[in-house]
Amino acid sequence: MVDKVPMTQGGFVKLQEELRWRQQEERPRIIEAIAEARAHGDLSENAEYHAAKEAQSHNEGRITELEDLTARAEVIDLTKMSGDKIKFGAKVKLVDEDTEEEKTYQIVGDQEADVKAGRISISSPIARALIGKEVGDSIEVNAPGGSKAYEILQVSWG
């Protein structure tokens, strides 16, 4: 069974754009760099050649990863999401019950997560604690710095 990878439309488009760039722009650039380095002679002590081959290996590995992710992508249409219970795609406003600090997060796929931008992975401890909860509920999250308690203030979509 192939596990689907949930993601937003925006996340899927970003993966497709990176895949296109790596295949159509980065791959030819690296091949050219390898050919140029090869022209410099002895490959055993040719740092440019070894660096280009390493870049090629990294790029091809990422292409394989992106092809797999886009093939297994389950694009979730956030415009069709609604309801009071928190699930994938929800924007959730929380208040830290100790510091009274408010935070807003959107629950997204693993590949889209960017905490600084307010996007947390569906598989993160805080997202797992939020799934199925509603406004007014409290959650407790075991974070690296200790346990944190939050109250859910708002749930929105889109």
UniProtKB/Swiss-Prot annotation:
One of its GO terms (molecular function) is DNA binding. It comes from the Bacteria. Keywords: DNA-binding, Transcription, Transcription regulation. One of its GO terms (biological process) is regulation of DNA-templated transcription elongation. The keyword Transcription regulation applies. It holds the Pfam family GreA_GreB_N. Belongs to the GreA/GreB family. Necessary for efficient RNA polymerase transcription elongation past template-encoded arresting sites. The arresting sites in DNA have the property of trapping a certain fraction of elongating RNA polymerases that pass through, resulting in locked ternary complexes. Cleavage of the nascent transcript by cleavage factors such as GreA or GreB allows the resumption of elongation from the new 3'terminus. GreA releases sequences of 2 to 3 nucleotides. This is Transcription elongation factor GreA.
